[in-house]
């Protein structure tokens, strides 16, 4: 197989013959290992170009990892439940991973609130970062685990994701966050009632719990300061995320990618969450906020600060992400040598 320069530095896939040899070549041009991939003709091999290497991902076309000749209940169930549409599979992947992420994040936030540690920035940064790490591991092999509508939209804007996929991913992310909010609320229902009673929304009070679900600014924060905070945080997040994803840059190994993203979120959150919570993720804020409105927190979750807050952590992460994406492209992305990919990513039969 001849050299194939990846057209997309973030998620290039090659449909190849199942009996092929993939040469792993590191950034120095050396060839440390060779790997032959052989499997059933019903399977597809996708070569995913990452930082200096080609990784093989096997996807079963109709047996979901089970032998066609088997006819036990597991094989029958797998064949019945398997979804042919890759687009649908990716949407389900994003939805489940977002549910996983938000379940961990909201559960940790609730525990911090109940134990009086809600104002500990290190603790909040820790559970934000590690929640996203494990969530990306859930979906990384299927959809990439973007888990952020603002970043998803930006990647589509940069031409690295189709607009149809963008719409499906974003819908799945909002949906997963909403369902996670409902589940965590039901799990902690008795604790919430015991802790807050009728005083749910008052974030200045001792027993308010609205801050478990959504972000709220400091009372002194101006409208201008709140907007700039959301834009700047998400801009930094996006620049860091794109640099981690770009195989032409110092991208971490595939298994370390979620950890790198989690450390990035942890650092940005720790640096800039004091004033307004550093949502950086529209689905992380608006989906739980909508759930709290439904279950009786009242319209104060939207009317807080005379309706001069709820739309800020929802709208301006999109602005910050777009700004970060454009900045990364202008300063880094467009300046790689055109033949860079050919020098470092090679397929051979």
UniProtKB/Swiss-Prot annotation:
Q: What induces it?
A: Most abundant aquaporin in early embryonic state, adult active, and adult anhydrobiotic state. Expression is slightly up-regulated in early embryonic state.
Q: Domain notes, please?
A: Aquaporins contain two tandem repeats each containing three membrane-spanning domains and a pore-forming loop with the signature motif Asn-Pro-Ala (NPA).
Spell out where the chain crosses the membrane: 92-112, 125-147, 167-187, 225-245, 256-276, 314-334
Query: What broad class describes the main subcellular location of this protein?
Result: membrane
| Sorted UniProt keywords | Cell membrane, Glycoprotein, Membrane, Repeat, Stress response, Transmembrane, Transmembrane helix, Transport
Give the way it sits in the membrane: Multi-pass membrane protein
Q: In which residues does the motif NPA 2 occur? A: 281-283
Q: What is this protein called?
A: Aquaporin-4
Output a single Gene Ontology CC term carried by this record. Answer: plasma membrane
List, alphabetically, the InterPro entries matched: Aquaporin-like, Aquaporin_3, MIP, MIP/Aquaporin
Q: Which GO terms describe its molecular function?
A: glycerol channel activity; water channel activity
Q: Look up and give the organism this protein is from.
A: Milnesium tardigradum (Water bear)
Q: Which family does it belong to?
A: Belongs to the MIP/aquaporin (TC 1.A.8) family.
Q: Which residues are glycosylated?
A: 194, 207
Gene3D superfamilies registered for this protein in UniProt = Glycerol uptake facilitator protein
SUPFAM superfamilies xref list: Aquaporin-like
Q: Where would you find this protein in the cell?
A: Cell membrane
Stated role: Aquaglyceroporin that may modulate the water content and osmolytes during anhydrobiosis.
- Record keywords: Membrane included? yes
Where is the motif named NPA 1 mapped on this chain?
A: 148-150
